[in-house]
Amino acid sequence: MEERGTGMGLNPAPSTGPVLAPAPKGILDPSTGKPVGANDPFFLEVNSELSDKGFFVAATDDLITWARTGSLMWMTFGLACCAVEMMQVSMPRYDVERFGFAPRASPRQSDVMIVAGTLTNKMAPALRKVYDQMPEPRYVISMGSCANGGGYYHYSYSVVRGCDRIVPIDIYVPGCPPTAEALLYGVLLLQKKIRRTGTIER
């Protein structure tokens, strides 16, 4: 009498081939076939130290800036048409949350304020009040020509010629309106600035 094969999952035949590792996850580099960043010297050094000792030593400041850049909570201060591009950054095409840049509704829970649009004289006290409600360290991204320097309405009697007259600005994103890619690049520059500045200087 013949034994049944592997049909319907009964009596599975033992596998004699080699056990394969799972395929690498993440965005693959077409030239190497490995995940993007796999050949980064920083990660190679960390991995070698972890495999050697089981832990690695880092400065507290490096740890704090790493955590801070990976969990920036931003609030919108959309004043005009630039706010539409700011909303687009959160949509699936760009998905700024993959960089740890998540939106919040309250200034008390936010690290970053994005000023997008024309700032008028009547709105300036509200902008300053919201900025003062944010906990330290706080950062501001000025998005678009109107927020940067008045833009199209620069000579209007009712427009503030740049929101840097009201709050300190960390990153300026130019354009009228700037594209979502430009704002995304501004976010990456802000993360780079936080890493460079550290906690004590701020």
From Swiss-Prot:
PROSITE patterns reported for this sequence: COMPLEX1_20K (PS01150)
Lineage: Bacteria, Pseudomonadati, Pseudomonadota, Alphaproteobacteria, Hyphomicrobiales
Gene source species: Bradyrhizobium diazoefficiens (strain JCM 10833 / BCRC 13528 / IAM 13628 / NBRC 14792 / USDA 110)
Family listed: Belongs to the complex I 20 kDa subunit family.
UniProt-listed Enzyme Commission number(s): 7.1.1.-
Annotated Gene Ontology cellular component terms: plasma membrane; respiratory chain complex I
Keyword terms, alphabetized: 4Fe-4S, Cell inner membrane, Cell membrane, Iron, Iron-sulfur, Membrane, Metal-binding, NAD, Quinone, Translocase, Transport, Ubiquinone
Listed InterPro entries: NADH_UbQ_OxRdtase-like_20kDa, NADH_UQ_OxRdtase_20Kd_su
GO MF, one example: NADH:ubiquinone reductase (non-electrogenic) activity
Cofactor section: [4Fe-4S] cluster
HAMAP family, per the entry: NDH1_NuoB
A Pfam family: Oxidored_q6
Reaction(s) this enzyme catalyzes, per UniProt: a quinone + NADH + 5 H(+)(in) = a quinol + NAD(+) + 4 H(+)(out)
The protein's role, per its UniProt record: NDH-1 shuttles electrons from NADH, via FMN and iron-sulfur (Fe-S) centers, to quinones in the respiratory chain. The immediate electron acceptor for the enzyme in this species is believed to be ubiquinone. Couples the redox reaction to proton translocation (for every two electrons transferred, four hydrogen ions are translocated across the cytoplasmic membrane), and thus conserves the redox energy in a proton gradient.
Classification via NCBIfam families: nuoB_fam, PRK06411.1
Compartment list: Cell inner membrane
GO terms, biological process: aerobic respiration; electron transport coupled proton transport
Gene3D superfamilies (UniProt xref): 3.40.50.12280
Record text on cofactor binding: Binds 1 [4Fe-4S] cluster.
Binding site for [4Fe-4S] cluster: C81, C82, C146, C176
UniProt-recorded name of the protein: NADH-quinone oxidoreductase subunit B
